Structures are given as C-alpha cells and as structure tokens.
C-alpha cells in the first residue's frame, strides 16, 4: 500500500521517487503535492474478526469502489496491443492521485510481504499464465494476450478493490472461452451471496461450474473482506462444500476473485517475491 514520505526532505533529488515509477525524485514528484498518509490499518490486526459495516462505512466503501470502477473503465478505453504494463501503472497512479485518493498496492506489505519486499507499483498486472500479483514493468502487450488488472484505491480511509480481465486483439477460441467461463464462475458465486448463507456456497458454485468444463480452481489465493482494511476476514474460497464456512450477514463486504486455470491449479512465486504463475504454464 502506498505511503508517500512525510516531506520531500526525506529524499534527495537523485533518489528513486517514492511513487514507484522508477524515475528519480527530481524528475517525478519533487515539488508536487504528496498523497495523504495511508491509514494505519492496511492489514487486519485481527484477521479472523469479521467486520460488519455501519451505514457510514458502507457509504465510504461505495465511494472508493466507484473510483476503482472508474479507473478500470479508463483502462478499458486505453488498453491495446503496444501498451506496456508500466503505462497501465502510470495511468492508474496519476489518476488516483488526481482524484485525491491513494493507490493501495504501492508499498503494500512493507516488512511483511514475501521476502520482506513491499509491492513496488500502484496496480497488479497479470498476463497469460500469471495468476495474480504481477508487477508492472516494460513488458508490451501483444495481440493474443489476456491480462487481469487489479486496482485498489483508498478514498477517505476506505478501500475499494476490484479487477477486470482484458482480451488483447484476437485470441484462440479456447482462451476466450476460459475468460468467458471465469466470468460465469464469478456470476454464479455472486448469486450465492445472501444473509444467512455460508461462504462455502460461493466456493461450491464456482468450483462446480469450473470443473464441469475441465478447468481447475486455484486454491492458493482467495477473496477476502475489504473496506475498512485492505484484507479482512472472511476468506472467500473459490471451492468448497455447501453449508460450510462463515455465515454471511447483512452489511458484510467482501471480494469474490475466482482464479481458474486450463491446467493444474497449483501456483509458484517468481523471484520478485510477488508474481504468482501457474506451475505448468497453462
């Protein structure tokens, strides 16, 4: 998650900019308004405590979620072959700051993330065999790619988290079908959300549809509560048994993020400590 320096005096002109752009401070944010400090509760201090939101909190989460949606709409208007994932990061970063918000992924996990490395960018960009948490770089999108862009912003202390899949140009029929059926998995999961239901109902609906088509469900990552903190309880597994898991209650807020593979469900983490890819390249 992102936090700018308390003041520009913390960085010299030739230091890398705090924003993660890779540019020197003098060429980037020197003399420009810094973002507001991020909330302290970016990671749940009690990961099993499910937060039932108040009406005030729900309105704050709606506001941050609307900005997240708008950022994804902006990407949809601009993304195409020839664009780099760093460009996507720059679009999101600059527009988030312009709106007075904070890009939550930037510097998220400082001292707690994989190998102690904070996430260095403002958005996750996951291409093809990358399951999630891909780090933007100079890779250029080409015809036939599929990419998931995961955006989380903080507005007035509240978190809005969403991702969207994009198809670049013409892709094989099997690839397009995977994207379409993963969307269907999401819709089937959402259809199970109701007060009095169990989170296992969501996972079961997703798993049943995916496996009926010969796909596998990633088990190493899941959806999660969100809103007051970046990651809250409950965990929303994308597989499961009906009638099991946590009780869904009115005013809970959580993400459903089905990750569906053509091949095996297992993942591995690349050397950057964040990027999760399929073990078989599918």
Residue ranges and their predicted role:
Residues 3-5, 241-242:
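A generic local structural motif
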Residues 6-12:
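Short, flexible, mixed-charge glycine/proline-rich loop motifs
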Residues 17:
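Short cysteine-rich clusters marking metal-coordination/redox-active sites
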Residues 13, 21-282:
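Active-site neighborhoods and metal-handling regions in enzymes and metal-associated proteins
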């Amino acid at each position: 998650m992102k936090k700018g320096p308390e003041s520009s005096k913390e960085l010299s002109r030739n230091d890398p900019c705090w924003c993660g752009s890779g540019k020197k401070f003098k060429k980037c944010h020197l003399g420009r308004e810094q973002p507001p400090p991020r909330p302290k509760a970016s990671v749940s201090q009690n990961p099993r405590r499910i937060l039932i939101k108040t009406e005030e909190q729900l309105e704050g989460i709606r506001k941050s979620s609307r900005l997240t949606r708008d950022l994804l709409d902006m990407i949809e208007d601009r993304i195409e072959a020839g664009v780099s994932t760093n460009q996507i990061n720059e679009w999101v970063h600059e527009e988030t700051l312009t709106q007075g918000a904070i890009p939550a992924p930037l510097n998220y996990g400082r001292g707690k993330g994989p190998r102690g490395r904070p996430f260095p960018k403002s958005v996750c960009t996951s291409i093809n065999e990358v399951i999630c948490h891909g780090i933007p770089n100079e890779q250029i999108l080409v015809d036939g790619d599929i990419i998931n862009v995961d955006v989380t912003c903080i507005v007035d202390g509240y978190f809005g988290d969403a991702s969207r899949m994009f198809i670049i140009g013409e892709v094989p029929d099997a690839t397009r079908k995977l994207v379409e059926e993963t969307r269907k998995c999401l819709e089937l999961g959402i259809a199970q959300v109701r007060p009095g239901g169990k989170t296992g109902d969501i996972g079961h609906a997703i798993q049943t549809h995916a496996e009926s088509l010969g796909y596998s469900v990633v088990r190493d990552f899941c959806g999660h509560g969100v809103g007051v903190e970046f990651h809250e309880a409950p965990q929303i597994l994308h597989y499961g048994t009906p009638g099991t898991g946590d009780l869904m209650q009115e005013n809970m807020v959580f993400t459903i993020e089905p990750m569906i593979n053509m091949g095996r469900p297992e993942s591995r983490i690349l050397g950057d400590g964040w990027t999760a890819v399929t073990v078989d390249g599918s």
